[in-house]
Protein backbone atom coordinates (compact mmCIF):
# COMPACT_ATOMS: atom_id res chain seq x y z
CA UNK A 1 0.00 0.00 0.00
CA UNK A 2 1.50 3.39 -0.97
CA UNK A 3 2.28 5.92 1.74
CA UNK A 4 -0.25 8.75 1.99
CA UNK A 5 1.21 12.17 1.12
CA UNK A 6 0.73 14.79 3.79
CA UNK A 7 2.43 17.65 5.58
CA UNK A 8 2.57 18.29 9.31
CA UNK A 9 3.45 21.52 11.07
CA UNK A 10 6.12 21.48 13.77
CA UNK A 11 5.51 24.41 16.11
CA UNK A 12 8.14 25.70 18.53
CA UNK A 13 6.51 26.34 21.93
CA UNK A 14 7.73 28.20 24.97
CA UNK A 15 5.23 26.29 27.18
CA UNK A 16 4.20 22.85 25.92
CA UNK A 17 1.41 22.44 28.46
CA UNK A 18 -0.20 25.77 27.53
CA UNK A 19 0.11 25.04 23.81
CA UNK A 20 -1.31 21.55 24.18
CA UNK A 21 -4.28 22.87 26.18
CA UNK A 22 -4.91 25.56 23.52
CA UNK A 23 -4.93 23.10 20.61
CA UNK A 24 -7.08 20.64 22.56
CA UNK A 25 -9.74 23.36 22.69
CA UNK A 26 -9.57 23.44 18.87
CA UNK A 27 -10.27 19.69 18.66
CA UNK A 28 -6.84 18.06 18.91
CA UNK A 29 -5.88 15.34 21.39
CA UNK A 30 -2.50 14.09 22.58
CA UNK A 31 -1.34 11.18 20.41
CA UNK A 32 2.31 10.85 21.57
CA UNK A 33 4.39 12.44 24.31
CA UNK A 34 8.19 12.38 24.18
CA UNK A 35 8.75 14.89 26.96
CA UNK A 36 10.00 17.93 25.02
CA UNK A 37 8.13 16.88 21.85
CA UNK A 38 4.41 16.12 21.59
CA UNK A 39 2.25 15.00 18.70
CA UNK A 40 -1.41 16.01 18.65
CA UNK A 41 -4.08 14.53 16.38
CA UNK A 42 -7.62 15.49 15.47
CA UNK A 43 -8.59 11.85 14.81
CA UNK A 44 -9.30 12.57 11.13
CA UNK A 45 -5.78 12.68 9.74
CA UNK A 46 -4.35 15.97 10.99
CA UNK A 47 -1.24 15.87 13.14
CA UNK A 48 0.33 18.85 14.85
CA UNK A 49 3.80 18.50 16.34
CA UNK A 50 4.75 20.70 19.30
CA UNK A 51 8.39 21.07 20.34
CA UNK A 52 9.72 22.77 23.47
CA UNK A 53 12.11 25.59 22.67
CA UNK A 54 14.04 28.14 24.62
CA UNK A 55 13.54 31.87 24.18
CA UNK A 56 14.90 34.00 21.40
CA UNK A 57 12.92 32.68 18.43
CA UNK A 58 9.77 34.74 18.96
CA UNK A 59 9.22 38.47 18.61
CA UNK A 60 5.81 39.22 20.14
CA UNK A 61 3.40 40.49 17.51
CA UNK A 62 5.71 39.57 14.63
CA UNK A 63 5.38 35.80 14.31
CA UNK A 64 5.35 35.14 10.54
CA UNK A 65 3.88 31.64 10.83
CA UNK A 66 0.21 30.71 10.71
CA UNK A 67 -2.01 27.64 10.46
CA UNK A 68 -5.35 27.27 8.67
CA UNK A 69 -7.64 24.52 9.99
CA UNK A 70 -10.50 23.54 7.69
CA UNK A 71 -13.46 22.16 9.64
CA UNK A 72 -17.10 21.44 8.87
CA UNK A 73 -18.62 23.01 12.00
CA UNK A 74 -16.82 26.34 12.37
CA UNK A 75 -19.35 27.64 14.89
CA UNK A 76 -18.86 24.67 17.23
CA UNK A 77 -15.10 25.22 17.29
CA UNK A 78 -15.61 28.98 17.76
CA UNK A 79 -17.82 28.31 20.78
CA UNK A 80 -14.91 26.47 22.46
CA UNK A 81 -12.55 29.46 22.07
CA UNK A 82 -14.99 32.39 21.90
CA UNK A 83 -13.04 34.63 24.31
CA UNK A 84 -9.85 34.19 22.26
CA UNK A 85 -11.27 35.22 18.88
CA UNK A 86 -9.31 38.14 17.45
CA UNK A 87 -12.13 39.84 15.52
CA UNK A 88 -15.26 40.57 17.56
CA UNK A 89 -18.39 39.02 16.09
CA UNK A 90 -16.43 36.31 14.33
CA UNK A 91 -16.79 33.87 12.67
CA UNK A 92 -18.06 35.52 9.52
CA UNK A 93 -17.85 35.34 5.73
CA UNK A 94 -14.69 36.76 4.23
CA UNK A 95 -14.54 38.42 0.78
CA UNK A 96 -12.46 35.48 -0.49
CA UNK A 97 -15.31 33.03 0.18
CA UNK A 98 -14.53 31.37 3.49
CA UNK A 99 -16.52 31.39 6.70
CA UNK A 100 -13.84 31.72 9.37
CA UNK A 101 -12.42 33.19 12.55
CA UNK A 102 -8.90 33.70 13.87
CA UNK A 103 -7.16 33.21 17.21
CA UNK A 104 -3.55 33.41 18.37
CA UNK A 105 -1.94 30.46 20.12
CA UNK A 106 0.04 30.97 23.37
CA UNK A 107 3.19 31.83 21.35
CA UNK A 108 1.49 34.20 18.93
CA UNK A 109 0.96 31.81 16.02
CA UNK A 110 -2.03 32.93 13.96
CA UNK A 111 -4.60 30.12 13.74
CA UNK A 112 -7.50 30.55 11.32
CA UNK A 113 -10.40 28.11 11.50
CA UNK A 114 -12.90 27.99 8.68
CA UNK A 115 -14.61 26.31 5.77
CA UNK A 116 -15.02 27.11 2.09
CA UNK A 117 -18.43 28.02 0.74
Locations of the language-model features?
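Conserved short beta-strand elements that form part of the metal-binding/catalytic scaffold
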Residues: 29-62, 110-115
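Vicinal oxygen chelate
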Residues: 14-17, 67-110
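Loop/turn position at the start of each blade in beta-propeller repeats
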Residues: 4, 35, 96-98
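N-terminal beta-strand motif that seeds the catalytic metal site of vicinal oxygen chelate
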Residues: 1-18, 65-67, 114-117
Amino acid sequence: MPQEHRANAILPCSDLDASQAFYERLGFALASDYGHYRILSDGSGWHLHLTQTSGGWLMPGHNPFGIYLYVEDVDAVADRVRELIIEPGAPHMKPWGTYEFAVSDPDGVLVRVGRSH
